[in-house]
């Protein structure tokens, strides 16, 4: 596990946390992709214990509470995100159990406990995917549901240039780390093949129930100009910007 990457990412997220308050939260899964209202991937949450990996400002946990979850748990590497989530959930009338920890070090969570574990655009920040997925497998009940969304693996391999999408970015065949600036703050993530995600889940005892690689119908139906922006509608018309996985613990 690369502790230097964790330290840098934590520092940057503590700086950025307030600027991301309330963004990319359930029922949304990400940018220009179908929502939970459309996909209906979650089971009934009434009376369930849920865990949010990378809980951010707590808006997805509030959505779970609004839909009947009985226990709201969350972890995040950013101390500031945890502070924001605690404040937001308390003001919203919900008790929560939030832990300031990297997802690679969530071993203190109860075992075989959660009915649903989910991560909305956060799981890809892990610097050790096998360890993180095994941590999740240890905390979720048999038959429990894991749902997560993240950038589609092709996103780092494609660049937009001169009205074309070109396969000239990262090498898809290698799970390399990528350094960049997010809102002016240095961060580092690992680019992973789709097979890396699927095989890691299988090796940890998960069964894939559904893999979503879609663009929102509203985006597909609307005319748009070509753009070089990372999350551009013109790109979303040609390829999925994100993917969503629903898996169950065997």
Language-model segments: which ranges?
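A short SAM/SAH-binding and catalytic strip from SAM-dependent methyltransferases
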Residues: 115-130
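Conserved class I S-adenosyl-L-methionine
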Residues: 1-46, 59, 63, 146-176
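A short glycine-rich, Lys/Arg-flanked "PGG" loop and its adjoining helix->strand segment in the class I
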Residues: 130-145
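Class I SAM-dependent methyltransferase SAM/SAH-binding core
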Residues: 51-53, 57-105
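A short acidic, Gly/Pro-enriched loop at the edge of an enzyme's catalytic core
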Residues: 107-117
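Core SAM-dependent methyltransferase catalytic element
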Residues: 204-206, 227-250
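Short alpha-helix
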Residues: 188-211
């Amino acid at each position: 596990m690369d502790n230097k990457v964790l330290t840098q990412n934590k520092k940057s997220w503590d700086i950025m946390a307030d600027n991301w308050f309330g963004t990319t939260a359930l029922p949304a899964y990400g940018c220009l992709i179908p929502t939970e209202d459309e996909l209906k991937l979650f089971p009934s949450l009434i009376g369930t214990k849920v865990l949010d990996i990378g809980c951010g400002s707590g808006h997805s946990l509030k959505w779970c509470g609004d839909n009947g979850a009985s226990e709201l748990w969350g972890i995040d590497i950013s101390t500031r995100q945890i502070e924001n989530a605690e404040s937001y959930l308390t003001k919203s009338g919900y008790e929560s159990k939030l832990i300031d920890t990297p997802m690679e070090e969530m071993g203190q969570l109860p075992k075989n406990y959660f009915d649903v574990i989910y991560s909305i655009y956060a799981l890809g920040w892990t610097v050790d995917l096998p360890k993180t997925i095994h941590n999740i497998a240890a905390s979720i009940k048999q038959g429990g549901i894991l749902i997560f969304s993240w950038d589609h693996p092709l996103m780092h391999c494609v660049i937009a240039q001169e009205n074309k999408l070109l396969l000239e970015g990262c090498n898809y065949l290698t799970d390399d780390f990528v350094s960049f600036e997010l809102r002016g703050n240095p961060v580092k993530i690992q680019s992973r093949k789709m097979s890396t995600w699927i095989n890691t889940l299988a090796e940890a005892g998960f069964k894939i129930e559904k893999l979503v690689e879609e663009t929102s119908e509203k985006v597909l139906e609307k005319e748009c100009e070509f753009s070089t922006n990372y999350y551009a509608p013109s790109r979303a018309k040609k390829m999925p910007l994100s993917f969503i996985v629903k898996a169950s613990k065997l």
